[in-house]
Amino acid sequence: MAVIAIGLDVVEVARARGLLERHHDRILDRTLTPEERLYVDSLGDPAPAFAARLAAKEAVFKALQVFDGARTIGWRDIGVRRLGDGRPEAVLLGHAAAVVSRRDLTLHLSLSHSRDVAAAVAILEDAPRLGVS
């Protein structure tokens, strides 16, 4: 596989906390999928997880900019879910899924957060070509 795009984003947890304090329901409904909302709302302190999801969505959005039509991808067109082993996985929905349709791609996502910041890296790879190793 060959890397075709990388996206990176960092979000301050304090900024995410402020958004939650001022606009909790509105900001969560606008930015998160229903599955993400359930997860974030289940946490005692949702700000770090919310910040990580914002960073992830922005990192994936940046990686997808190599495709025509990607500029209009919305917050809820990119989801983040946790796999059984705890790793994050990006899920492309709606317009994001349409932008990459009929392409054989792998999207890797890594998230990290501390008390102060959340960061995400998205790496987009194309499928290996037949007969090429």
Show which residues each predicted segment covers:
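Core catalytic alpha/beta fold that binds nucleotide/phospho-ligands
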Residues: 1-133
